[in-house]
Amino acid sequence: MTKRAEAKYKIDRRMGQNIWGRPKSPVNRREYGPGQHGQRRKGKLSDFGTQLKAKQKLKGYYGNISEKQFRKYYAEAIRLRGDSGDNLIGLLERRLDAVIYRAKFVPTVFAARQFVNHGHVKVNGKRVNIASYLVKVGDVIEVKESSREILIVLEAKQLAERDVPDYYEVDHNKMTAKITRIPLPADVPYPVLMEPNLVIEFYSR
């Protein structure tokens, strides 16, 4: 197993949940966290502990976003009009690596980040190599023609584990995607329960 895969599955084990719904997740075989103390019985979490876990799970799901960057999403979420939890999910789903993952151009969100960073993606005809780039409604996201035969892309085309959400328009022949609206948390096909309002509460303490 690669170091990247090990880190990914360590997140699953720490959360005690298969947060991406992957068949090879270690929590499909055991229900304790990583490390020598992982098998200890866990007591009931405090409010702080519950909020912290919700934050770690959401950060982990989107590729273990850095704390500094995640806090910026919180600040923007509370600045925008409407429900802050809804706003937080909307921002995360607009990340370019999240769009590439949702469109099924690559098999994992970790692969999506690397794919974007390596310059394989265009937005409105221009190359963008920043995974955290926020896509707008109507933007056209495209896999570069020279990158469409990369093995990881070919493998992703065979995926049957997840469907493309209805807030995207995706053409897998042309390898293009477009976000048609900003999703609400209930629209996002998370394999496990995400609680963005607990994340907002965590940072609002």
From Swiss-Prot:
InterPro entries: Ribosomal_uS4 (IPR022801), Ribosomal_uS4_bac-type (IPR005709), Ribosomal_uS4_CS (IPR018079), Ribosomal_uS4_N (IPR001912), S4_RNA-bd (IPR002942), S4_RNA-bd_sf (IPR036986). Residues 18-46 are annotated as: Disordered. It comes from the Bacteria. Keywords: Ribonucleoprotein, Ribosomal protein, RNA-binding, rRNA-binding. Transmembrane segments: none annotated. Pfam families: Ribosomal_S4, S4. GO terms for biological process: ribosomal small subunit biogenesis; translation. SMART domains: Ribosomal_S4, S4. Residues 94-157 form the S4 RNA-binding domain. GO terms for molecular function: rRNA binding; structural constituent of ribosome. One of its GO terms (cellular component) is small ribosomal subunit. Part of the 30S ribosomal subunit. Contacts protein S5. The interaction surface between S4 and S5 is involved in control of translational fidelity. Belongs to the universal ribosomal protein uS4 family. PANTHER family: 30S 40S RIBOSOMAL PROTEIN, SMALL RIBOSOMAL SUBUNIT PROTEIN US4M. One of the primary rRNA binding proteins, it binds directly to 16S rRNA where it nucleates assembly of the body of the 30S subunit. This is Small ribosomal subunit protein uS4. It comes from Methylocella silvestris (strain DSM 15510 / CIP 108128 / LMG 27833 / NCIMB 13906 / BL2). The gene is rpsD.
